[in-house]
Regions:
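Terminal amphipathic alpha-helical/low-complexity segments used for targeting or macromolecular assembly
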Residues: 1-59
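Flexible, glycine/small-residue-enriched loop-and-beta-strand segment within the central core
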Residues: 66-76, 81-130
Length: 130
């Protein structure tokens, strides 16, 4: 089983596995691009969100800055709105329904790690869906 498969299945996985880091960095680039789009260019913003998110509609709206780890594990329903500084650590699936409005400075975190420093330094994590 790959580290990616372990991550999605809720098993302990190596968070610094090169294949995972490649996907993380690719999503970071997409988020950076999204956050640089002019505030009134709604079409470009929506197109970029559709590249980032696993599922999004034409009426999906997120005020930048927006950050997520993988993006492809995030599914949002119709008429979704998130205000400034929305952060999603989507190591596991994140499913958000229709007509959801999220306030500023909200984070959704699926990733977990040990609180013991020695265990945490192994870079092992697990993730649970939200």
């Amino acid at each position: 089983m790959t580290e990616y498969e372990k991550m999605l299945s809720g098993e302990i996985y190596n968070a610094v596995d090169p294949s995972l880091l490649k996907d993380l960095y690719a999503c970071s680039e997409l988020c950076w691009e999204y956050n640089q789009i002019r505030p009134t260019d709604f079409k470009a913003r929506n197109e970029k969100l559709k590249q980032i998110l696993g599922e999004a509609d034409d009426d999906t709206f997120i005020n930048p800055p927006f950050h997520c780890d993988y993006g492809k594990h995030i599914k949002v329903g119709r008429r979704f709105f998130a205000n400034f500084n929305f952060v999603v650590l989507d190591e596991a699936p994140v499913t958000i329904g229709d007509d959801v409005f999220i306030g500023p400075n909200v984070g959704i975190y699926t990733a977990c790690h040990s609180t013991d420093p020695k265990e945490r330094n192994t870079r092992e994590e697990w993730a649970k869906p939200v």
